[in-house]
Design a protein with these regions (language model features):
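Post-HEXXH active-site segment of zinc metalloproteases
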Residues: 156-181, 185
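Active-site recognition of the HExxH zinc-binding catalytic motif
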Residues: 129, 140-161, 165, 192-193
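Cytosolic-facing loops and C-terminal tails of multi-pass membrane proteins
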Residues: 220, 224-280
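Hydrophobic or amphipathic, alpha-helical segments that drive membrane association/targeting
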Residues: 1-107, 252, 270-280
Length: 280
């Protein structure tokens, strides 16, 4: 539901912007486009300078979105190249063979003493674990971490979280998108924990692994991973996850940002009023 809202709203806005840009640049006659109606109404009111600003907003939104996505993709490719150079091929092959039954997930085990566990990549995501983490965890904890990350990989969470964060950054006039992006990350981590609990049969493995990773991780390691497209085992909503692991029956209540919802709803309401007024 959160992804549907966070992706559906900006998709609708982008479609409207595309239709409006085609009308302004190439003369497409699209009379049911909300931005065209805004332009038509402003022309009747003599506010064409606002119409030019609206076209500039459309072009900046498309250019900014394309630029941000390109930057994220370049950063991820650079990160993957770095990880491949640090890969311990023996460990990687061992894990790929051990968990081959899980719809063939791709494991990359890097030679690093610090514990690392995350899923990275847009189009071909893979699970990255460090030798330090594998030495630190017992078999039950390792299995729980793997199932957690496999859940992210199956559901392409790095791609989805990236899209939501880019849309939220490029459409600040719809503030509910920022909230949706943040809450989506929390929900996905909780669902990944649930996957691990269901697969292992209890919450001991995932809870113990999370606590070990939090104690061992230094701030520099976490900070160095914030710019690449990944879903990390220990970076998101830690307090909520620990509370729920201690009390699995406890419901997680998502906070509704009333101010952001009000602002976002007002934007759509104003567009609707312009639509009705213009065709009336």
């Amino acid at each position: 539901m959160l992804f549907t809202v966070g992706f559906g709203i900006p998709l609708l806005v982008l479609v409207q912007m595309f239709m409006y840009a085609m009308y302004k640049l190439f003369g497409w006659d699209i009379r049911l486009n909300l931005l065209w109606l805004c332009n038509h109404w402003m022309s009747r009111m003599g506010w064409m300078s606002v119409g030019h600003f609206l076209l500039l907003l459309v072009l900046l939104t498309f250019a900014g979105t394309s630029w941000l996505l390109s930057v994220r993709m370049i950063q991820t490719r650079a990160a993957m190249a770095k990880l491949r150079s640090m890969e311990n091929h023996i460990w990687s092959e061992r894990l790929n063979a051990r968990y081959e039954h899980l719809r063939r997930p791709r494991f990359v085990v890097v030679e690093q003493s610090s514990p690392v566990a995350f899923t990275i990549g847009l189009w071909r995501p893979c699970i990255v674990l460090s030798t330090g983490l594998l030495h630190m965890l017992d078999p039950e904890e390792e299995e729980a971490v793997v199932y957690h990350e496999v859940h992210h990989l199956w559901h392409r969470d790095p791609l989805k979280t990236t899209l939501l964060s880019v849309f939220a950054a490029m459409m600040p006039y719809i503030p509910v998108l920022k909230h949706t992006s943040q809450q989506y990350r929390i929900v996905r981590e909780i669902l990944a924990d649930n996957e691990a609990i269901e697969r292992t049969g209890n919450a001991v493995g995932i809870g113990s692994a999370l606590l070990k990773l939090l104690r061992a991780c230094s701030p520099s390691i976490v900070e160095s991973r914030t710019q690449i497209i990944q879903s990390s085992f220990a970076d998101t909503s830690v307090n909520v996850r620990i509370s729920r692991l201690l009390d699995p029956e406890r419901d997680v209540k998502l906070r509704l940002p009333r101010y952001a919802i009000l602002i976002s709803a007002t934007v759509f309401l104003l567009l609707s009023i312009l639509f009705v007024w213009s065709i009336g």
